[in-house]
């Protein structure tokens, strides 16, 4: 089995056992408000669900324990007005056999296998566009499907857990008009037999109403 095949197997195995869910935002639970290494690992393994920061952080640990070079990265979703949300989505970049791959086990849709990060590369129905930020050594990748931008990935390792903690706190204190995931209960499980995400609740079931 190739290294890429092994990586995909790990990813599918994790997706199959852990659902994406933002239910904790609506539940009022308080013990989850601190992004602590052991608390997050225990939470994900116990409940078998989580949001991007929880799921991708735990999978990052799993990859590291398997001696697979990887690092956490910030990604941003685009608003309808063209700006990007301040809250970032957490994901992973893996370095394998001289190539980079985008890994996301905490989105709840689209991502079912490692996505090769090369300019104009296509993995399944995911297309990647490479960008170099002017006057910096930082690069970004625009990840889209059907010509719709899903995420802008900043290729810069996020090594400080305090930065994730700050974003985590910001998410749980955000209002519905400030971030899409704070408006609806969104829960998905991954079916490895069909390679599809299955909704656990009706899509876009509104829990909190806001003017946005």
UniProtKB/Swiss-Prot annotation:
Pfam family, one: Acetyltransf_2
Active site, renumbered: 52, 89, 104
InterPro entries: Arylamine_N-AcTrfase (IPR001447), Arylamine_NAT_domain_sf (IPR053710), Papain-like_cys_pep_sf (IPR038765)
Gene Ontology MF terms: acetyltransferase activity
Disulphide-bridged cysteine pairs: none
Signal sequence coordinates: none
This enzyme's EC code(s): 2.3.1.-
Superkingdom of the source species: Viruses
Keyword RNA-binding: no
Record keywords, A-Z: Acyltransferase, Transferase
Xref: PANTHER family: ARYLAMINE N-ACETYLTRANSFERASE 4-RELATED (PTHR11786:SF0), N-HYDROXYARYLAMINE O-ACETYLTRANSFERASE (PTHR11786)
Recorded family membership: Belongs to the arylamine N-acetyltransferase family.
Record's protein name: Uncharacterized acetyltransferase R151
Species assigned in the record: Acanthamoeba polyphaga mimivirus
């Amino acid at each position: 089995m190739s290294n890429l095949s092994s990586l995909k197997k790990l990813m599918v195995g994790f997706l199959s056992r852990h659902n994406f869910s933002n239910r904790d935002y609506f539940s009022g639970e308080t013990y989850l408000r601190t992004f602590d290494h052991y608390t997050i690992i225990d939470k994900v393994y116990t409940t078998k669900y989580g949001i991007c920061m929880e799921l991708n952080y735990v999978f990052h640990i799993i990859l590291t324990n398997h001696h697979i070079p990887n690092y956490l990265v910030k990604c941003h979703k685009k608003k309808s007005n063209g700006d990007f949300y301040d809250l970032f989505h957490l994901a992973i970049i893996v370095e394998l056999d001289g190539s980079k791959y985008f890994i996301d086990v905490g989105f709840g849709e689209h991502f079912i296998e490692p996505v090769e990060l090369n300019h104009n590369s296509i993995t399944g129905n995911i297309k990647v566009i490479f960008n170099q930020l002017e006057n910096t050594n930082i690069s970004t990748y625009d990840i889209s499907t059907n010509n719709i931008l899903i995420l802008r990935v900043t290729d810069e390792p996020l090594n400080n857990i305090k930065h994730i903690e700050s974003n985590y706190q910001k998410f749980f204190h955000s209002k519905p008009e400030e971030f899409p995931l704070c408006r609806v209960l969104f829960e998905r499980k991954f079916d490895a037999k069909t390679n599809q995400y299955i909704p656990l609740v009706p899509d876009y079931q509104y829990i909190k109403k806001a003017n946005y």
